[in-house]
Amino acid sequence: MSDIDRSPGFGVYVHWPFCAAKCPYCDFNSHVRHQPVDQQRFVRAFAAEMAHMRARTGPRAVTSIFFGGGTPSLMEPATVGAILESINRNWSVDDRAEITLEANPSSVEAERFRGYRDAGVNRVSLGVQALNDQDLRFLGRLHDVAEARRAIEIARSTFGRLSFDLIYARPGQTPEAWGAELDEAIGLAADHLSLYQLTIEQGTPFFALHQAGKFAVPDPGHAAELYRLTQEVTAARGLPAYEISNHARPGAESRHNLVYWRYGEYVGVGPGAHGRFLEDGARTVTIAERLPEKWCALVEENGHGIVDGEVLSRSQEADEFLLM
């Protein structure tokens, strides 16, 4: 195992907050805009906030970069390239750094993916969520299974590494149905799967529908059975869990996920992004403004969009470390 795989690492998280549509289960910081987003304005804001972060972190060797959202695949490849150039200007990026971009199957085009690859992206994470058209409609996804399979094939032929997400413990889902879907997913996956139980989050459309009795989720016993099945099937097929929801072939674990789980340092740039890094020897937390346009305005005024944060005490650090 190389040093880059052993160390906690230093990560950069970039939040692109825009989506084509808001999924009914999602409580992430994502926003729909019906007019084109001024991507150049955001590129300038990302560059300014990164320069601010560099002044606070000092020199670091970046081992992972993660474009999350939102839907980062709505960014033009040139936008991704410009953001990566800003990261390179502020820190040294390891030659073996993992650079991941989240994408939705509905926004996948071969030429666009080649553009991301040429910009420097070497890993893609697809929001597939289900391999069943009825459940995709229930989840409010804009793609169907055929589009998902096509996106997976394009991603596998374009990037060295691929992951995709599935949501399970969906209403009415049986162990037999989930086992078959999981088996198909493992056959399609290159080396990594992120498998999440459906949770009903307050403030989402699903929360209101669930409260109104419009649908039911599996009871805790049934959900636990689906979780056990998930662990058994993935382990038997060579993709054991390396943390709660992520499964990988040995050596294909997400380095950026491991930054979090190994209590490494990372900076977060963009609307709503969080960071945790050492500043003057103390572990510092930063939290950025969530609303995209307000974040941009703050960066333009102050050089950053950070609105909250703290320096952790030793006891707080110890508590966080134990939770990892």
What are the residue ranges of the model-derived segments?
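C-terminal scaffold of the Radical SAM
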Residues: 2-11, 29-56, 60-324
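Short active-site neighborhood of thiol/selenol oxidoreductases, capturing the structured segment around
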Residues: 12-16
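Local cysteine-cluster metal-coordination motifs and their immediate loop/turn environment
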Residues: 17-30
